[in-house]
Curated annotation (Swiss-Prot):
It comes from the Bacteria. GO terms for biological process: DNA recombination; DNA repair. One of its GO terms (molecular function) is DNA binding. CDD domains: TOPRIM_recR. The gene is recR. This is Recombination protein RecR. It comes from Streptococcus pyogenes serotype M5 (strain Manfredo). Keywords: DNA damage, DNA recombination, DNA repair, Metal-binding, Zinc, Zinc-finger. A zinc finger (C4-type) spans 57-72.
């Protein structure tokens, strides 16, 4: 069935979001059309404000509205550890468990030869730069338990080991192929407590 152009454009916009197919995009579009003008205006304002006001921390790469982010400026955190994650959602997941008190580094992707992603395509050089001051003694690699996550963790280990930095990996309480952002707090807590050296 063909829809009027404004609805078709809205469906197309929603379908560009990850995990949103045409059916869900259509439902969202019709739901949006049914919202009050005030709610639609608030939604649009919030969307534009988030896009305009958020940036990536110049130190760790986390999503923030202040640069550097509140985690990087928190001097009460453990300065000897950096936990490396794939994206900003993983930082939020780790912060929820309130167990890890070190700093973070967000890669914004994983090494994935099948997808044409190499070490230069992720936020890895700035991690190496951060380690040059000698304060960090351990890097915890918390990439997802996928082939790309494993490839990335092994690459990080190979690069950092010669510098004498201990590189550990989250324990395997996480199922292979699972995403950190969807793991429950107990699983993440056990994964940090039982991490293994690479």
């Amino acid at each position: 069935m063909l829809y009027p152009t404004p609805i078709a454009k809205l469906i197309d916009s929603y379908s560009k979001l990850p995990g949103i197919g045409i059916k869900t995009a259509t439902r969202l579009a019709f739901y949006t059309i049914g919202m009050s003008n005030e709610d639609v205006n608030d939604f649009a304002k919030n969307l534009l404000a988030a896009k305009r006001e958020l940036t990536y921390c110049s130190i760790c790469g986390n999503l923030t509205d202040d640069d550097p982010c509140h985690i990087c400026t928190d001097t009460s955190r453990d300065q000897t550890t950096i936990l490396v994650v794939e994206d900003a959602k993983d930082v939020s997941a780790m912060e929820k468990i309130q167990e890890y008190r070190g700093y973070y580094h967000v890669l914004h992707g994983l090494i994935s030869p099948m997808n044409g992603m190499g070490p230069d395509d992720i936020n890895l050089k700035s991690l190496i730069t951060r380690l040059m001051d000698g304060k960090v003694s351990e890097v915890i690699v918390a990439t997802n338990a996928t082939a790309d996550g494993e490839a990335t963790s092994m690459y990080i280990s190979r690069v950092l080991k010669p510098a004498g930095i201990k590189v550990t990996r989250l324990a395997r309480g996480l199922a292979v192929g699972s995403d950190i952002e969807y793991a429950d707090e107990v699983t993440l807590l056990r994964a940090i407590e039982n991490r293994t050296e690479l």
